[in-house]
A protein has these predicted regions:
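Glycan-recognition and catalytic cores of secretory/periplasmic carbohydrate-active enzymes
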Residues: 1-233
């Protein structure tokens, strides 16, 4: 967005540092004795979203695979089948004095919504139906919760809107040759869409989809912009 290369490289360095810190164990923070504090749902899902964002920016397949594994682990650790939502703390550490299900936004958007956002990106990229079933289940649960907590669930409304529009940009061929188009699209659409890479030795083009309605092969920035304007995306 800022076209600041120095900021970009410093950010990538910070991401690499986070990856190293969380390589063997995800934790919330250190205490004064530098001991690790147990995690919450948000620690897992925000790290997952960071990983899949790195894939979208850099075509880093290792980050994509790590995100996939981490979201699977998140589901196993936090999903409450009775409430059909992800609870705030790991299931085995439930505290009877604290409600483990928390669906409202606090200082940051709620972890359930961020899981849905990352999960939808992952489904768009991998086409793995197991992610689609989780998306459908959570979106139904969100709709029922919104009726009672509308004023405190704004991030859910935004994420459900992103999910319903489901905008994707798929880059085919030599990804490096499409970087100019990709950088321009990042400025406006990175937050509300999924960027997908399909490397091959064939022709280079972009396909834009919104809610399963897709463009033809678009080979220039002009063609991309014309399509976006024509379809009001």
């Amino acid at each position: 967005i800022l076209e600041d290369n120095d900021l970009y490289y410093r950010t990538i360095a910070k991401v690499d540092l986070i990856n190293k810190k969380l390589k063997t164990n995800i934790f919330h923070c250190y205490n004064k004795n530098k001991q690790e504090i147990d995690v919450f749902l948000e620690d897992y899902v925000y790290f997952s979203l960071l990983l899949i964002s790195v894939y979208e920016v850099k075509n880093d397949k290792n980050s994509l695979k790590k995100c996939e594994n981490l979201l699977k682990e998140t589901w196993e650790l936090f999903y409450d089948s009775e409430n059909q939502l992800l609870q705030k703390n790991i299931k085995r550490t439930n505290d009877i004095f604290v409600s483990p299900i928390d669906v409202i936004d606090n200082n940051i958007p709620n972890g359930n919504g961020i899981f849905l956002l990352a999960c939808n990106k992952l489904y768009n990229i991998t086409a793995d139906e197991s992610w689609k079933s989780k998306i459908d289940l959570l979106s139904r649960s969100f709709h029922s919760c919104i009726n009672n907590n509308y004023s405190q669930m704004f991030s859910y409304l935004k994420i459900l809107d992103i999910y319903n529009n489901n905008i994707t940009f798929t880059f085919h061929g030599n990804i490096e040759k499409l970087n100019k188009i990709k950088k321009e699209l990042f400025k406006k659409y990175f937050e509300i869409s999924t960027f997908i890479h399909r490397e091959s030795n064939d022709e280079d083009f972009v396909v834009i989809c919104k809610n399963k309605v897709c463009s033809n092969k678009l080979k220039s920035l002009e063609q991309v912009n014309n399509y976006l304007n024509e379809k009001s995306i």
